[in-house]
């Protein structure tokens, strides 16, 4: 199975996804290689979503020699990808290789590191910009963020998505690495969300970072440390 259920989340099991994740986890991986790795990982995840979450239909096709039956993926015109700025940008770039006709939304949301994590394991979230396309009942909405840590940011983003007038056919949360705490928080905030991650790591540290994780994905992708 390309995507396996693990409790409240699902894991992308493709060998190339695990290979790319291992490469970008490495502290020695430099900025360009890290960013390109996130792009490749997004592309692999996109193909696995197509294989594991989208339906196909048979259709007649005329070849140069005869008529035969072929198979097409349904719903490729009805995909919305939401980029959670900024870390998701290279991840989304890869997803767009798999979904070139997807409509795109952008939400600039980040946690307040100075305020710190409260006793419930949550961060206050600052949302500075939201631009979403119209969402229809036929859509598959993919919210992409490489790191699902405390789940505070994703729960806030989901509030914006679900406040739209129309409920999409499928609502997917896609991450490269997730913490158990974040999965629980997102599942409680939006039970209908289908959480998909390449890896589910051990825990969060006292600062709310995923362990073993891969560091700050945004800083590593954009070399802002």
UniProtKB/Swiss-Prot annotation:
EC number: 2.4.2.9
Regulation of activity: Allosterically activated by GTP.
Organism: Haloarcula marismortui (strain ATCC 43049 / DSM 3752 / JCM 8966 / VKM B-1809) (Halobacterium marismortui)
Gene name in the database record: upp
Note describing how the cofactor binds: Binds 1 Mg(2+) ion per subunit. The magnesium is bound as Mg-PRPP.
Residues binding GTP: 36-40
Role description: Catalyzes the conversion of uracil and 5-phospho-alpha-D-ribose 1-diphosphate (PRPP) to UMP and diphosphate.
UniProt-listed InterPro entries: PRibTrfase_dom, PRTase-like, Upp_A, UPRTase/APRTase, Ura_phspho_trans
Catalyzed reactions: UMP + diphosphate = 5-phospho-alpha-D-ribose 1-diphosphate + uracil
Name recorded for this polypeptide: Uracil phosphoribosyltransferase
SUPFAM superfamilies for this protein: PRTase-like
Residues that bind 5-phospho-alpha-D-ribose 1-diphosphate: 86, 111, 145-153, 216
Taxonomy, superkingdom: Archaea
Similarity annotation: Belongs to the UPRTase family.
Binding site for uracil: 210, 215-217
Keywords in alphabetical order: Allosteric enzyme, Glycosyltransferase, GTP-binding, Magnesium, Nucleotide-binding, Transferase
Pathway info: Pyrimidine metabolism; UMP biosynthesis via salvage pathway; UMP from uracil: step 1/1
Keyword Transferase recorded: yes
Obligatory cofactor(s): Mg(2+)
Swiss-Prot/TrEMBL GO biological process terms: UMP salvage; uracil salvage
GO molecular function: GTP binding; magnesium ion binding; uracil phosphoribosyltransferase activity
